Regions:
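Short aromatic-glycine-enriched beta-strand elements
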Residues: 94-100
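Generic marker of residues within folded, mature protein domains
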Residues: 76-78, 135
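Structural detector for short beta-strands of small beta-barrel domains
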Residues: 78-94, 143-147
Length: 252
C-alpha cells in the first residue's frame, strides 16, 4: 500500500535495571527518547524484560548503542564478551553477589570474595567489605567486571576516586535528567562534578571543603521532592587517607 511505511524495531538489552524505584522506568524512557530523537532516530520503546533488565526497541540500533555508550563510563549494552556491566545484588559474609544480562535476556549470577578485590587494589587491612564500600561497591550499584575481577575501566574509576581526594555520593535509580534537576534545585553548590556510570547510577564528587553530612541531608530532601524512592550512599574519602596507593598497583 502506498504511503504506508512499516518501521522495524530492533531490540537491545541494557545492563541496567531498577533497584527499588519503579517510577524510574518512565523517566528513563523520557531521557533515552530525547537524546535518540535529537540524534536523528525516529521510533523507540522501552520496557522491562526477563530478570527486570531494561529492554529498548529502536529503529536504529547502532545509533542508539553509540549514543548510550558516549554518555556512560560503563558500556550499558549487554554482551557475551568481557567486560560485563553488572549490578551488585547482595553483600555479606565476605562475598559480593552480582548479576548481569546476556543479549538473549537471560541473567548471569556470580559471586566474588571481597578480599580478592581488596587485595587486588592494594588494601592490607582486615575490613574488606568496608574498604569496597568506601569505593562505592554497595548493593544496587553498577560495577564492571572481567573474569570475576575489576575490569580496566572499573580500576580506572577506583583510582580516580582515590587520587581526586574528594568525598563522593553514589546515586541509584536516578536518570541523568533527574541528576541535573537536583543540581539545579540547590545541590550545585556542593558539587564539583558528577559522572554517569550507567543510565541509572552516578557518582557525585563534592567540592573540596564541603561537608559530606550537610550535603547528604540536602540531597535527601531534594530526592524526596524530585525522585522519591531513589537511593544514595555517602562515601568519605578519609577511609583512603592511610592507605599507600600507587598507580603501579593498577594494571590499566
Amino acid at each position: 500500500m502506498r504511503g504506508f511505511l512499516k518501521v522495524f524495531l530492533r531490540m537491545l538489552i541494557l545492563a541496567e535495571r531498577l533497584w527499588r524505584r519503579v517510577e524510574a522506568v518512565s523517566r528513563l524512557e523520557e531521557w533515552i527518547r530525547g537524546i535518540f530523537l535529537e540524534a536523528g532516530g525516529s521510533s523507540l520503546k522501552l520496557s522491562q524484560g526477563e530478570g527486570g533488565w531494561i529492554t529498548v526497541e529502536a529503529d536504529d540500533e547502532r545509533l542508539l548503542s553509540s549514543i548510550l555508550r558516549l554518555n556512560m563510563r560503563f558500556d550499558p549494552i549487554s554482551s557475551m564478551s568481557q567486560p560485563h556491566t553488572a549490578k551488585v545484588v547482595k553483600i555479606g559474609r565476605g562475598r559480593v553477589s552480582y548479576e548481569y544480562p546476556l543479549p538473549d535476556g537471560s541473567t548471569m549470577r556470580k559471586t566474588f570474595h571481597s578480599r580478592d578485590w581488596a587485595v587486588q587494589l592494594g588494601y592490607e587491612g582486615d575490613d574488606f567489605e568496608g574498604f569496597l564500600e568506601a569505593l562505592g561497591v554497595v548493593e544496587g550499584m553498577s560495577i564492571s567486571t572481567s573474569l570475576n575481577m575489576p575490569s580496566s575501566i572499573q580500576m580506572r574509576i577506583f583510582l580516580d576516586e582515590v587520587l581526586r581526594g574528594l568525598d563522593r555520593i553514589v546515586l541509584i535509580d536516578l536518570t541523568p535528567q533527574e541528576v541535573e534537576e537536583i543540581l539545579e534545585s540547590g545541590f550545585k553548590g556542593f558539587t564539583a562534578f558528577y559522572e554517569t556510570l550507567t543510565p541509572l547510577t552516578h557518582i557525585v564528587y563534592l567540592k573540596l571543603g564541603s561537608s559530606l553530612d550537610k550535603a547528604s541531608k540536602r540531597l535527601e530532601a531534594l530526592i524526596h521532592s524530585i525522585a522519591p524512592g531513589a537511593s544514595y550512599r555517602p562515601l568519605s574519602w578519609r577511609r583512603f587517607s592511610k592507605i599507600d596507593w600507587s598507580e603501579a598497583r593498577f594494571e590499566i
